[in-house]
């Protein structure tokens, strides 16, 4: 079975949240590895936020899902990949998910992510 999720976000929303709450916002949403990879590049952070939302939709995770349990990093070839932890991982195991593929993109104003999970 295939499970899909898509999300789009205005990059300015991530910028506004970072301006309002600073590092506290970033540390609540992103893992240390994601923050290190993105180096405060807002389009990249926004795309990873969209990926987290897309995973939540694909796996039908609860609305209070911890974003830090969903991590989007890059493989050595640059392709994005998803790592799950905690409750997100438990749900994926329950669904029999064997693979999660993610595609990220952004332009000046928006970032988008598409996730396909398969058992």
UniProtKB/Swiss-Prot annotation:
EC main class here is transferase
**Which SUPFAM superfamilies has this protein been placed in?**
4'-phosphopantetheinyl transferase (SSF56214)
Q: Which family does it belong to?
A: Belongs to the P-Pant transferase superfamily. AcpS family.
Compartments annotated for it: namely:
Cytoplasm
Q: Which UniProt keywords apply?
A: Cytoplasm, Fatty acid biosynthesis, Fatty acid metabolism, Lipid biosynthesis, Lipid metabolism, Magnesium, Metal-binding, Transferase
EC code(s) of this entry: 2.7.8.7
In terms of superkingdom, the source organism counts as Bacteria
Pfam families from the entry? ACPS (PF01648)
InterPro entries from the xrefs?
Answer: 4-PPantetheinyl_Trfase_dom, 4-PPantetheinyl_Trfase_dom_sf, ACPS, Ppantetheine-prot_Trfase_dom
One GO molecular-function annotation for this sequence? Answer: holo-[acyl-carrier-protein] synthase activity
Tell me what this protein is called: Holo-[acyl-carrier-protein] synthase
Q: Which residues bind Mg(2+)?
A: 7, 53
GO biological process terms on file: fatty acid biosynthetic process
Function as written in the Swiss-Prot or TrEMBL entry: Transfers the 4'-phosphopantetheine moiety from coenzyme A to a Ser of acyl-carrier-protein.
Q: What reaction gets catalysed by this protein?
A: apo-[ACP] + CoA = holo-[ACP] + adenosine 3',5'-bisphosphate + H(+)
Q: Which GO terms describe its cellular component?
A: cytoplasm
Q: Which cofactor does it need?
A: Mg(2+)
Q: Which organism is it from?
A: Dehalococcoides mccartyi (strain ATCC BAA-2266 / KCTC 15142 / 195) (Dehalococcoides ethenogenes (strain 195))
